[in-house]
Each structure stands twice: as structure tokens, then as C-alpha cells.
């Protein structure tokens, strides 16, 4: 009988303290998430120092809760996976040092995981990854198109040249007057409005899979500023709808085109913005028309969580890609450099 492989995973790259236990690469035995949204809401965004303090306060309790929920002990764990980056360096160090302490104390292998690889592997939980595939990464800090020919093989074929899509959502939300986090609020409001504004769609160079959202963001901000200056009433839902349609149209078109050019029949979506209902519907419609298999994680697995780190960590475990206790956190790590040889 084959022994079950249990991975304890730790994620502290931004404003969620999360610990998970993953069995055999796909089964979630526990996935404890301690959110900091309420603490950051009054600032209108994540404050790194506040985030780090909350991670320090919550990491030990979160580890214990994850083990209890999974009904396992540290002796049962085969390896410890942890997000090494990219992310907020102070936040990352809390998780990395906690993972190193556990690895040392219990003599367990230590697995460093790229945060974006984790988001990609969240899809593997719901449906096994099949290759080749295109991954559309949409989050607060990243917007990328990635070609994967096999497990842990990452070729970035497109990325944002300025703002990530999540950043654009948050800035537009603040301009409209919505509370943090802005992305989900814009998505909800967009479902109630009409596309009455001609906001730009930024395509960039012909055949380019890069993205740019700073011009769109500025167009929305300038439109609202001009209307307020002239005392012209603003219908917030229409602004949200028009903005979201501009974003979704570009993301969908480039993702589908990438699938066609690379002769790929599988598209996966990863990152916090993958929970956006407008984007999910647009991709579903176009994938159906183009006979492309679409996988998007359930919303709870789109946002930062340790389960996705554990799933990616299991693939790294199988390849024997471990770190020693000199492991450190890194605010920036190139996904392609992290790719398997």
C-alpha cells in the first residue's frame, strides 16, 4: 500500500495568514485562513507593517488550527512548503521563518514555493492539470499569460507593462467611493449598470500578449473628475460596468488568442481577480465557442491561501526540489527562473 504524502503549507505573502495540510497533492485536509481585511479597510489598502504584525500574532495559532482540523500531528507531516515570494518582504519572512523553525525542530524537508505557481496549482485541486495549457494570472500584483508544457514549466508569454489588473480595480473603486477591497465591490456594482462610457481597450502591439491598464484607469479617474467639476450626476454602476467590460474584453481576447497560437485546448485562470463574475462568464462564453476547456478555481481558492501552496509544493516534493535552512523571503522572483529545468 502506497503511503500518503502529507504537506504542511504556509502562506503569508500579503495580508492573509494561512496554513494548510494537503494529502497526496490534491486533497485538502485543512485550510485555515486568518484574514486581515478589517484591519486594512480604514487605510484603503494593505499597510505592510500592519500586515507583518498580524502575521506575527497569528502564525502559531494558525499552524495549530490547521493540524487540529486535519487531525494530524507534526510527526505525520512529510514536508513543509512555504511561499518564499513574491510578496511583501516583511510578511513573507514571518511565514518563511515559521516554516524553517518547524523544518528544523521536526527534521522535515523544506519546500520553497513561488506564490504565482501556487495560484496556478489551485486549479489542480478541482481538476487535474493536463498539458499543454495557458494560464491567465490576474491578481492585485500580477497580470500574466503563462504557457505550460508540463508540471512546473513556466514560460511567461505576456505580462502587464504598468498596473496589474487588481491594482486598476482598487484605484477605480476608490475613485468611485467604494470600500476596500475594491475589486469585489466593482464586480457587484457592474452587474447592476449599463455600458454607457466609451473607456479605452488597450491592445498594445499587434500579436503582443502584454497588458496595460494605466491608461484605462486614468480615463476612468479623469471622467469622474470632469463630471464632478461640472456637477454632472455620476451613475456609479454604469462606471463600474463600462470599466469592467473594458478590462474583461482585453483579458478574454488575449487569453483565447494565446490558446489558438500555442495550439492549446486548456485554459486555466489564477489569482484573486479570477473570482470576478464578469470575467468568469466572459471566459466561459468564449471558451465554449472556441472549444477550449476552461478551469477556474472556486472563489475561496482564488484568493491567497495555503492549500494552493501545498498543492504546488507536492509537485516540487516529487521532483526533490528542497531548500536548506538558509532559505529567505524574496519580494520579487521571476517565474521563469523558478521553472523546472
Swiss-Prot record:
InterPro entries recorded: ATPase_NBD, Gcp-like_dom, KAE1/TsaD, Peptidase_M22_CS, TsaD
Cofactor(s) for this UniProt protein: Fe(2+)
Keywords: Acyltransferase, Cytoplasm, Iron, Metal-binding, Transferase, tRNA processing
Keyword tRNA processing belongs to the record: yes
Catalyzed reactions: L-threonylcarbamoyladenylate + adenosine(37) in tRNA = N(6)-L-threonylcarbamoyladenosine(37) in tRNA + AMP + H(+)
HAMAP family referenced in this protein's UniProt entry, alphabetically: TsaD
Name of the protein this chain belongs to: tRNA N6-adenosine threonylcarbamoyltransferase
Amino acid at each position: 500500500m502506497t503511503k500518503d504524502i502529507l504537506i504542511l503549507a504556509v502562506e503569508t505573502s500579503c495580508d492573509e495568514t494561512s496554513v494548510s495540510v494537503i494529502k497526496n497533492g490534491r486533497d485538502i485536509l485543512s485550510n485555515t485562513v486568518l484574514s486581515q481585511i478589517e484591519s486594512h479597510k480604514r487605510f484603503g489598502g494593505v499597510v505592510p507593517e500592519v500586515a507583518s504584525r498580524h502575521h506575527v500574532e497569528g502564525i502559531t495559532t494558525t499552524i495549530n488550527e490547521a493540524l487540529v482540523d486535519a487531525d494530524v500531528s507534526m510527526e505525520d507531516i512529510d514536508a513543509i512548503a512555504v511561499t518564499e515570494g513574491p510578496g511583501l518582504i516583511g510578511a513573507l519572512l514571518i511565514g518563511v521563518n515559521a516554516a524553517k523553525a518547524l523544518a528544523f525542530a521536526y527534521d522535515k524537508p523544506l519546500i520553497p514555493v513561488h506564490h504565482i505557481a501556487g495560484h496556478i496549482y489551485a486549479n489542480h485541486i478541482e481538476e487535474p492539470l493536463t498539458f499543454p495549457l495557458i494560464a491567465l494570472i490576474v491578481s492585485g500584483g500580477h497580470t500574466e499569460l503563462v504557457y505550460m508544457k508540463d508540471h512546473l514549466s513556466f514560460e511567461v508569454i505576456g505580462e502587464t507593462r504598468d498596473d496589474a489588473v487588481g491594482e486598476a480595480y482598487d484605484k477605480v473603486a476608490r475613485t468611485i467611493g467604494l470600500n476596500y477591497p475594491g475589486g469585489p465591490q466593482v464586480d457587484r456594482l457592474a452587474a447592476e449598470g449599463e455600458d454607457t462610457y466609451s473607456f479605452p481597450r488597450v491592445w498594445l502591439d499587434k500579436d503582443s500578449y502584454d497588458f496595460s491598464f494605466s491608461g484605462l484607469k486614468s480615463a476612468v479617474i479623469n471622467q469622474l473628475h470632469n463630471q464632478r467639476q461640472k456637477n454632472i450626476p455620476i451613475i456609479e454602476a454604469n462606471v463600474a460596468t463600462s470599466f469592467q467590460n473594458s478590462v474583461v474584453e482585453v483579458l478574454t481576447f488575449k487569453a483565447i488568442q494565446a490558446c489558438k497560437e500555442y495550439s492549446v485546448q486548456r485554459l486555466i485562470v489564477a489569482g484573486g481577480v479570477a473570482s470576478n463574475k464578469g470575467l468568469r462568464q466572459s471566459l466561459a462564453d468564449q471558451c465554449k465557442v472556441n472549444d477550449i476547456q476552461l478551469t477556474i478555481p472556486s472563489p475561496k481558492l482564488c484568493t491567497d491561501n495555503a492549500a494552493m501552496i501545498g498543492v504546488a509544493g507536492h509537485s516540487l516534493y516529487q521532483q526533490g526540489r528542497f531548500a536548506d535552512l538558509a532559505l529567505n523571503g524574496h519580494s520579487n522572483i521571476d517565474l521563469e527562473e523558478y521553472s523546472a529545468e
